[in-house]
Amino acid sequence: MLSTLSALYGHLAESGVIPANPAALNRSRLGLGARDASPTIRLTAAQVAALLTAAARPTVRGRYARLHATRSVAYVALLTLGLRVSEITGLDRGDRYRTGGDDVLRVLGKGGLHREVYVTELVREALSDYLAERDRLAGTANPVRRGRSGTGASPLLATRAGARCSRIDLYTQLRRIAADAGPALDGVAERVHPHALRHAYVTIALEHDAPIQHVRADVGHATIATTQHYDRGLRRRSASAADVVAKALDLYKS
């Protein structure tokens, strides 16, 4: 129980929601020796695929069963793009559009900087299924046009009542999915959190020989800000690792 709370508070502290992790152990006060910080869990492509499979399993019955399942799949699918959870919760329906013949998401990253993230077929199908079910049940506000925002914007991921999902909502949802993922996540399910999938995006991409500069551009690391300034107009789908990661995950989909 303590490890679960510590992981939750650790994620909130990392995201800037709270100043520090109140569940972290004070090792010196307890007379324990110093140790290296526990690294982010390293998920394999097979484990990420298991999360996608588990997300599709209905967890509620009745009218909203398909809505919950499709939203869970859409959420995990978005995480396979290497997005931060804060970037996912900030997405509006109008942030999804086509450019140069490709589906993209306009993501607001750290420092208030936007970047375009290429949408894989996995993510496109997951979002289409979820949004179609959401619209069928209750309808939503019309998507805002590209570059526009305001109080009328419709969140890409929403609660059943139509409100924007919070980071805690999605964190809790991912923990539930991980717990249902079966043997593939044995021993690590309690340590799965959104940043672990962002980390997995980077490691899977690099393991499959994606150019590191493409990976850094995909995830919005600050260290490539200068490169992006000069390369923004030339960036194409071929300069993204998204399809590399999607192909790796496809090998393990059931």
Q: What spans do the regions from the language model cover?
A:
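Conserved catalytic core of the tyrosine transesterase superfamily
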Residues: 1-254
